[in-house]
């Protein structure tokens, strides 16, 4: 099967998956493919769903979105605790609509869990009652993540062993699940939902730039974001006084820039923290995809298009 012509029909390949670290050129590749094939670009990044953070999350520009259909970008308010489960539900509707129109779905982003949900399935954890979530968060603020990790170790040792004791979000999530449902997060993962797109029906590529060049691009892009009024974007968000544990409030650069707006640190220091956090995230993305989704073909950004065109659906 050669090329990526939509005329081949959905039987040839159901979707293209383009992953990679932040600032690796994923969006440009996806847009180019969408223009070539008449495809639909579908966001697979957990931060680009938020309408309030177009600049700081490097969402496609309005001009880029006008060149091809883009879905699941900026459709969620920052006040929403948007989850992988919510994204799967939204993506299912978009995927079905796209395939019904005989168009190529092009999933693009850097959120490994979203891609894993596409090709491997997702755990079927039920909604957590607000009173349980609020109680766990209050204890997190009062006692700290390490204390909650010790509690988790007693009631869900298997999950606790996989988590860093200082990982506030994941420790709190695991604890609220076991306290709300009486089952461990590990058990829920074992009884997960089926994959939306089995791996054998997709072409999947991971853009793997040379590290030093990637880090230089990350640093330059953060400066460009500030020049494009990312600080004003964060200021508007800060005025709403949202829960700092919400996903949007933890986007790279947001906490540091809020500290600057409060007068706690200089803008230069906030930018330094934002750049460092983004570089560390990119490093984790390399590691995560290598171990969790080995079916993705790794390619240099300049070669990724050719790799996709040569690849057989796996």
Swiss-Prot record:
EC number of this enzyme: 2.5.1.75
Cysteine pairs bridged by disulfides in the record: none
GO MF annotations, alphabetized: ATP binding; tRNA dimethylallyltransferase activity
Positions of region (Interaction with substrate tRNA): 45-48
Reaction catalyzed: adenosine(37) in tRNA + dimethylallyl diphosphate = N(6)-dimethylallyladenosine(37) in tRNA + diphosphate
Cofactors (names): Mg(2+)
Record's keyword annotation contains Ribonucleoprotein: no
Site feature location: Interaction with substrate tRNA: 111, 133
Keyword Ion transport: no
Classification via InterPro entries: Dimethylallyltransferase, IPT, P-loop_NTPase
Binding residues for substrate: 22-27
Leading EC class: transferase
Key words of the record: ATP-binding, Magnesium, Nucleotide-binding, Transferase, tRNA processing
Binding-site residues, ATP: 20-27
GO biological process: one example: tRNA modification
Function according to Swiss-Prot or TrEMBL: Catalyzes the transfer of a dimethylallyl group onto the adenine at position 37 in tRNAs that read codons beginning with uridine, leading to the formation of N6-(dimethylallyl)adenosine (i(6)A).
Family: Belongs to the IPP transferase family.
Subunit structure: Monomer.
Protein name: tRNA dimethylallyltransferase
Organism: Nitrobacter winogradskyi (strain ATCC 25391 / DSM 10237 / CIP 104748 / NCIMB 11846 / Nb-255)
Species classification: Bacteria, Pseudomonadati, Pseudomonadota, Alphaproteobacteria, Hyphomicrobiales
């Amino acid at each position: 099967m050669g090329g990526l012509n939509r005329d081949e029909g959905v039987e040839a390949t159901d979707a293209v998956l383009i992953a990679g670290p932040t600032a690796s050129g994923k969006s440009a590749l996806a847009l180019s493919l969408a223009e070539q094939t008449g495809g639909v670009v579908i966001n697979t990044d957990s931060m680009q769903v938020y309408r309030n953070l177009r600049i700081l999350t490097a969402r496609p520009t309005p001009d880029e979105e006008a060149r091809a259909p883009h879905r699941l970008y900026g459709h969620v308010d920052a006040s929403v605790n948007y989850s992988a489960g919510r994204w799967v539900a939204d993506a299912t509707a978009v995927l079905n609509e796209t395939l019904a129109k005989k168009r190529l779905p092009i999933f693009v982003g850097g959120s490994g869990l979203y891609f894993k949900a596409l090709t491997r399935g997702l755990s079927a954890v039920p909604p957590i009652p607000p009173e349980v979530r609020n109680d766990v968060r209050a204890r997190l603020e009062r006692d700290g993540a390490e204390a909650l990790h010790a509690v988790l170790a007693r009631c869900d040792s298997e999950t606790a062993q996989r988590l860093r004791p200082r990982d506030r979000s994941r420790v709190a999530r695991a604890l609220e699940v076991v306290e709300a449902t009486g089952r461990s997060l590990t058990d829920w993962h074992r009884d997960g939902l089926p994959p939306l797109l089995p791996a054998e029906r997709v072409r999947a590529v991971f853009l793997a730039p040379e590290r030093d060049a990637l880090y230089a691009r990350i640093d330059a892009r953060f400066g460009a974001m500030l020049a494009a009024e990312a600080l004003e974007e964060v200021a508007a968000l800060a005025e709403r006084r949202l829960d700092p544990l919400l996903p949007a409030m933890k986007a790279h650069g947001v906490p540091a820039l809020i500290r600057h707006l409060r007068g706690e640190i200089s803008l230069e220091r906030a930018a330094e923290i934002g750049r460092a956090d983004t570089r560390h995230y990119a490093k984790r993305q390399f590691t995560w995809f290598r171990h969790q989704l080995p079916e993705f073909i790794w390619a240099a950004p300049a070669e990724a298009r050719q790799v996709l065109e040569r690849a057989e659906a796996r």
